[in-house]
Amino acid sequence: MRTLLISLMAVGLFAASSCVNEGGQVFGELPEGVVPGSGEALEARGAVYNKDLNELKISWRTTPDPKLYKGVEVSFQALGGQSKTIRIMANPNFSSSYDYFTVVTKNPATVQYRCIWNKESGEEVSEWASADNLTVTNVASSDVFFDIVPPTFKLVTEDNVSAQVAEAYDGIVGKTDEEKKAYYTQILQIVLSSIYNSIVDAGQQPVSWIKCILGKMDYPGAVAYVSGDSEGPLMRLSSEYVEQVSTGAVSMEDATFEIRGVLIHEFSHLVQKTGAVGSNQPSCIEGMADAIRSACGGVTDANRISGALNAGVYYDENRKSGDTPCPYVWQMPYGTSGYFMNWLRTYDGDFLRKMTITIEKMGSQWSLEKAVQYILGENYKMEDLWNEYIEDAKSENVG
């Protein structure tokens, strides 16, 4: 399957007169008057569905003439169940936007798309094509990043951890050292797959060494955090939280979900780009980590919806004070901006990967607003997007 995955991902698109699947089925002729650059038919190579991220990636066979190809219009069922019709435009800022497009959905069969073409007299579109007619390969993030070199793990259980707590910990992350290392590696793989396209982008060994500690927390109420000591990076997991499992105060199911989500957030800090952005842009650091957590399925729907509906007013002068001014709600850290950034994948399934590129590219000039316009286009206004995000959350809350 890995060979098939690599071949599916290393494809492009050529300019064309119709949309067809691998079997040659024609979905729609281009409108009269559109002259394709190569005279060939526009053909979808196939599709890859990442079940961890709910991402359907449809790749074209050969790269099109950028003078003719403008992008695709896509109709699909969004993660919240809403029916959406959006445009994913070819963007010169990202050459890959001419090779494929990505849709975030739990129901790939609902995805329909039509090509948008440039013409002297105006814009033309093809007829609708259905992803349901494509060959879809289902993958996990571990398939995409199967060839990373895992970190060297140092596993530590502190002496003050009781046997009962250690046993509960084993039930969540694995009984043997090898099982624990595999668990942490899978967390790292899903984080990497949410913000990087490939190991080439992320690096062969993005994290070379990490100490994973089960012990008491320095910060009351925290479940886990990532820091460092003289040996290098470390991740500390709360034995107090795990103790609630051993006493029955927290179910094993809830603890397993929560610990996975927290570790996704913390491992994000090991591999995310921060560049010259600095801590005065909390949405870039803590917001991004929660965006990754949400994208990777580490947040309950109830918490995600509540985070949107209780985010506060769109603009508040009182939030201008302090070292990290956040007058706009989408500037705020953690889930307030993070769940919104994850929702922006509605408009481009590669949004978080492209945002990683903007963080490196823009450095100290980065802002979420600039990143959105760089990725989606200047016609996308933050307040309009935020309002739609809140309306989607309200529709889910009613449902």
Question: Could you tell me what each predicted segment is?
Answer:
Residues 331-399:
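Pan-zinc metallopeptidase signature
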Residues 102-123:
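Beta-strand-rich modules
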Residues 84-94:
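Solvent-exposed serine/threonine-rich low-complexity stretches and specific carbohydrate-binding patches
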Residues 63-83:
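Solvent-exposed loop/turn segments flanking beta-strands in beta-repeat/beta-sandwich domains
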Residues 224-307:
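Zinc-dependent metallopeptidase catalytic helix centered on the HExxH motif
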Residues 174-240:
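Auxiliary, metal-adjacent structural segments of Zn-dependent hydrolase domains
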Residues 23-67, 124-142:
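Pro/Thr/Ser/Gly-rich low-complexity, intrinsically disordered linker/stalk tracts
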Residues 15-18:
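C-terminal motif of bacterial Sec signal peptides marking the signal peptidase cleavage site
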